[in-house]
Design a protein with these regions (language model features):
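Extracellular loop-to-transmembrane helix junctions
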Residues: 1-24, 205-210, 309-322
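Membrane-interface alpha-helices at helix entry/exit sites of multi-pass transporters
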Residues: 32, 36, 40-47, 83, ...
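Transmembrane alpha-helical segments of multi-pass small-molecule transport proteins
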Residues: 44-51, 73-98, 114-115, 252-257, ...
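Selective recognition of specific alpha-helical transmembrane segments in multi-pass small-molecule
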Residues: 2-10, 84-98, 109-129, 162, ...
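Helix-loop junctions at the membrane interface of multi-pass solute transporters
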Residues: 14-20, 51, 93, 168-191, ...
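Transmembrane-helix boundary/entry motifs in multi-pass membrane transporters
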Residues: 1, 11, 15-55, 73-76, ...
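Membrane-interface loop-to-helix entry segments
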Residues: 66-71, 77-139, 272-279, 305-328
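Extracellular/periplasmic helix-exit of transmembrane alpha-helices
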Residues: 10-17, 121-137, 145, 149-152, ...
Length: 337
């Protein structure tokens, strides 16, 4: 609920303070309402800098790694080749600008989401008898006696909260301010309408897609130590394969690659907006970004994950600070509630 409210606020302000530059292009995002709403250009510059770093980290390398891992696990495509293909496809899309980016997302994401939900429901239908036990394990792990006792309880709880929040933000991006950038170019709309769409996106991503994924993994891996030894996209693909065979594994793998690809091209746009605000690296940014996409599929990402968490936190700090001071300007018309 906090994430949904935050998504509404940042998107509302992003659309409210947006403006067109001399090329007729919408300029929008936290760096705009930090300048025009708060009058603090330094805060805007800090936000844009960390957004640029995130675009080269979690927005490109992490997503490319996930896609390459899926391609290698499902079809045996080497990671180097998989990340190279992803970089080429990304380059083809970004050469078309924001309109092509929007068109790609418009066609790819609904199809991939529909396939993912359909196959997830099929798996859960086949594992219906295990669903109650899956929920029981979730609540036992969260609130069990073992989890609140012992000398390291405080550390364990704080670590769980830390990773829960960081991965939740990684998933739905509520609080980072990126929704304000992505919704800003929408034509023939209002801040309220885009804010409501942003709220729905957070709900759909976290409550629907992430919950379905968790249930599928819990229901299909009971007692399966071999599958549990896998991680990331390979674990998800193996879980669907266990119940739906090769067809299920292929369709889910395609969906996960599409999700990763769509996220990559969205983060290219986010990084582009950030560097234009900073007036830095604009000429070499496409090369830097595509290089990061290629590298992401070829290297281990422990350090990238750690740095991405740090950069996410700094982005959220500046954005949430701006939201706090601009809360009074956010309106919630009754007709949208």
């Amino acid at each position: 609920l906090i994430g949904m409210a935050t998504a509404y606020g940042e998107t509302y302000l992003g659309v409210r303070y947006r403006f067109k530059n001399n090329r007729g292009k919408w300029i929008c995002g936290p760096f705009v309402y930090m300048k025009k709403g708060l009058g603090i250009p330094f805060m805007a510059a800090c936000y844009s800098f960390f957004c640029f770093l995130c675009a080269l980290g979690m927005g490109s390398m992490v997503q490319a790694n996930s896609a390459a891992e899926t391609l290698e696990f499902t079809w045996g495509i080497p990671s180097v080749l998989g990340s190279g293909i992803l970089a080429l496809l990304t380059g083809a899309v970004i050469l078309g600008g924001i309109k092509r980016i929007g068109k790609a997302a418009e066609y790819l994401l609904p199809l991939a989401s529909g396939i993912y939900i359909l196959f997830s429901l099929l798996v859960l239908l086949l594992c219906a008898d295990r669903i109650p036990d899956a929920f029981l394990r979730i609540f036992q792990s969260a609130f069990g006696i073992r989890q609140v006792s012992g000398g390291i309880a405080g550390f364990g709880i704080s670590k769980s909260i830390r990773y829960g929040i960081s991965r939740g933000v990684f998933s739905n991006e509520a609080g980072l301010g990126t929704l304000a950038v992505l919704h800003g170019p929408a034509e023939h709309t209002t801040p309220e309408e885009q804010g409501m769409w942003a709220m729905f996106e957070v709900f759909f991503d976290t409550v629907v897609l992430c919950s379905l994924t968790a249930l599928v993994i819990l229901c299909t891996t009971q007692g399966d130590t071999e599958t549990l030894s896998l991680t990331g996209a390979a674990l998800a693909a193996a879980c669907f394969s266990a119940k739906l065979g090769v067809i299920g594994e292929w369709f889910i793998s395609i969906s996960m690659v599409v999700f990763a690809f769509a996220t990559v091209i969205a983060w290219y746009y986010l990084g582009q907006q950030a560097i234009e605000d900073l007036s830095l690296f604009s000429r070499i940014y496409p090369v830097l970004f595509l290089g990061a996409v290629f590298a992401g599929g070829c290297i281990r990402l422990e350090a990238v994950w750690m740095l991405s968490d740090l950069w996410n936190g700094l982005m959220a700090f500046f954005n949430l600070t701006a939201l706090l001071f601009l809360t009074g300007e956010v309106e919630y018309p009754d007709r949208y509630i």
